[in-house]
């Protein structure tokens, strides 16, 4: 996670950063079940996660999602892992604040 990216984007406003990260975490909890193997509509969810992740500086997550869009459902475990890593990084970042 590139939190510097988000900090620059939010002009250092800690309130905005906190709100954005909290919203991402809440959305991640809704996205996760939609990434189960065999889930219908997974491609749309992956596309949404790609944009949301890149928007907060989760470049690796965005790249994994782009790869899954191109390759297919077999990469959903990789997407789930990258999403979990992004959420863990957010938790650690927010714990420091």
Predicted feature descriptions by range:
Residues 2-48, 74-97:
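Long, amphipathic alpha-helical coiled-coil segments characteristic
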Residues 61-73:
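Short helix/strand-capping connector loops at secondary-structure junctions
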């Amino acid at each position: 996670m590139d939190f510097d990216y988000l900090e620059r984007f939010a002009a250092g406003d800690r309130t905005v950063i906190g709100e954005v990260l909290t919203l991402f975490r809440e959305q991640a909890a809704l996205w996760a079940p939609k990434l189960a193997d065999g889930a219908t509509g997974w491609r749309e969810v992956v596309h949404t996660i790609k944009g949301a992740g890149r928007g907060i500086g989760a470049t690796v997550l965005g790249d994994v999602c782009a790869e899954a869009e191109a390759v297919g459902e077999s990469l959903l475990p990789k997407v789930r892992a990258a999403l979990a890593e992004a959420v863990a990084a957010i938790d650690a970042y927010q714990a420091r604040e």
